[in-house]
Every structure is written in C-alpha cells, then in structure tokens.
C-alpha cells in the first residue's frame, strides 16, 4: 500500500543522485544561513544586505518547499514553484551586479519599471559571461509551468498501460522529472548561497568544509 505521507526513509525518489546532491546543498545552505542570519540583525545594513534579508530567506524557503514536494511525489507542484524560486535567486544576483537595479529594489521594485526575469538573465549573461551562454527563451519553460499553457502538459503526464494520463495527485513514476527539477534547483540555490556569502562577507560552506 502506498503511504499517504512519505518520510525521508521511504520517499519515492530516494537514492537519486541529483536528489542527493540537492539535499547536500540544502544542508550547506542552512549552515551558511545560520552564520549569516545573526549578521543581519544590526542597525547599519547596506542596501544590498537589506535586499538579501528579504530575498535569501524566501529563496531558501522555496527550495525547501520544492524538496518536500519531491519527497511527497507532487512533482508538478515542485515544477510550478521553480519560477518564483529562480526569480528570487536571479533578482538577488541582479541587484548585486546592477546599482540601478538595487535602486529600483529600494523604490519598491515596481512591476512597471523592474526588468523581467528574461531581461535580468540576459543582463547577467552579458555582465558575467560576456554573452557566451545562450539565454534566449530562458524564462519560457518557467512561465509555461506557472501559467498553464498547453506546453505545461509535459510535466503532468504519465503513461499507464501505454496510454498517456494526467495525474491529479502524487506522481511516483517519473524519476526523470524528479532529476530535472533537482538539476534546475541546484545551481540557483548555489547562486543564492554565493550572494548571501558576498553580502555578509562569509565563506561559503560546502560538504566536507570546516567551520568555526
């Protein structure tokens, strides 16, 4: 009988390599956050630190939410959360590298003035990679899953006796999709860790590293 609620010892995608990597990164992220959080309690924070105080916890919370949805087999829900998760990580990197972006953030990040996720990705690609990484259509899949266009069906379909069906509950038979979600989440959580570390001048914590 399939458990109603899975635990870390019996979850459906337990043992997947990318899931293990995601778990390890989450542990490192929480350890780094434990070092940085006390530094955010001061009165004299920089504009970047104040932005990080909002964006970093939200990014981590969404990463944990995605992880729990994978554990419970709700892969489509995890996929839908990827856009808000990625957007926060990208926004944090954008305001770190763009003083005008940071000023927009300080002014309330007005929807009519702030750059789209795609435009932020394009800017960072030019700024950091000199345009070497093709970013065209970067936000398309995220938008598709979020807004529910026909293309989004690919993340909520399984084959039962050779026939495609669209599940309404747990998806326990799509390890490839679980891997895809983890592969998307890992670099952006790592990016948020880098920005957190830079904002509060802390060395990043990785598996096997020593802390004081």
Language-model features, listed with the residues they occupy:
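Residue-level recognition of alpha-helical structural elements
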Residues: 48, 71-78, 131, 178
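Short runs of predominantly hydrophobic/aromatic residues within well-ordered alpha helices
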Residues: 52, 78, 82, 135-138
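Short, hydrophobic, well-ordered secondary-structure elements
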Residues: 56-97
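"Short basic amphipathic alpha-helical interaction patches in structured regions
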Residues: 81-83, 99-108
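Short, charged N-terminal helix-start/capping segments
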Residues: 1-17, 51-73
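Short, contiguous, well-structured surface segments enriched in hydrophobic/aromatic residues
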Residues: 30-69, 110
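Short amphipathic alpha-helical interaction/hinge segments
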Residues: 93, 97-100, 150-153
């Amino acid at each position: 009988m399939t458990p109603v609620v899975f635990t870390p010892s019996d979850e459906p995608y337990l043992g997947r390599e990318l899931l293990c990597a995601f778990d390890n990164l989450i542990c490192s992220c929480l350890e780094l956050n434990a070092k940085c959080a006390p530094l955010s309690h001061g009165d004299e924070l920089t504009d970047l630190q104040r932005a990080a105080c909002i964006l970093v916890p939200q990014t981590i919370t969404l990463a944990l939410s995605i992880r729990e949805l994978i554990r419970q087999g709700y892969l489509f829900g995890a996929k839908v959360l990827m856009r808000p998760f990625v957007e926060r990580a990208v926004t944090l990197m954008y305001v770190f590298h763009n003083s005008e972006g940071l000023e927009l953030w300080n002014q309330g990040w007005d929807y009519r003035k702030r750059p789209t996720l795609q435009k932020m990705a394009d800017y960072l690609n030019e700024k950091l990679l000199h345009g070497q990484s093709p970013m065209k259509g970067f936000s398309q899949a995220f938008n598709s899953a979020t807004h529910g266009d026909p293309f989004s069906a690919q993340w909520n379909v399984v084959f039962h006796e050779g026939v495609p069906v669209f599940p309404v509950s747990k998806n326990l038979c799509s390890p490839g999709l679980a891997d895809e979600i983890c592969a998307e989440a890992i670099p952006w959580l790592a990016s948020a860790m880098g920005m957190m570390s830079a904002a509060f001048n802390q060395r990043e914590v990785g598996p096997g590293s020593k802390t004081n």
